[in-house]
A protein has these predicted regions:
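Nucleic acid-binding interface residues in structured DNA/RNA-binding domains
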Residues: 1-112
Length: 112
């Protein structure tokens, strides 16, 4: 359990860094938190986010740029609203990752 808490804290620290108007994928957050295989762990951590004011979990989308249908803090439409308030444009619930993805990546994320 101690490692799980540590993993969650690493994930929250990465998500805190995602700038307004940008998004990151679950896999990107996982890699930046230290393990590119943690994509599902990122989802679990964000679902129980203890501080939505300072940990902007709505800025995390899947690898296709889709918002979460199970967004824990108001549902899919709320996640879309929050992203749009920051200037992120969505088409059919999708974010254009080429335009809005946060550029911070790691060698591990790139698979090198």
């Amino acid at each position: 359990m101690k490692n799980e808490i540590s993993a969650f804290e690493k994930i929250y620290e990465v998500v805190r860094q995602i700038p307004k108007g940008k998004v990151a994928t679950y896999g990107q957050v996982a890699a930046l938190a230290g393990n590119r295989r943690w994509s599902r762990v990122v989802g679990y951590a964000l679902h129980v986010n203890p501080d939505t004011e300072n940990i902007p979990c709505f800025r995390v989308v899947n690898r296709y740029g889709e918002v979460s249908k199970a967004f824990a803090f108001g549902g899919e439409n709320q996640q879309i609203r929050l992203l749009e308030q920051e200037g992120v444009k969505l088409v059919d619930g999708h974010v254009d990752l080429k335009k809005y993805q946060w550029e911070r990546v790691t060698i591990e994320y790139l698979g090198r």
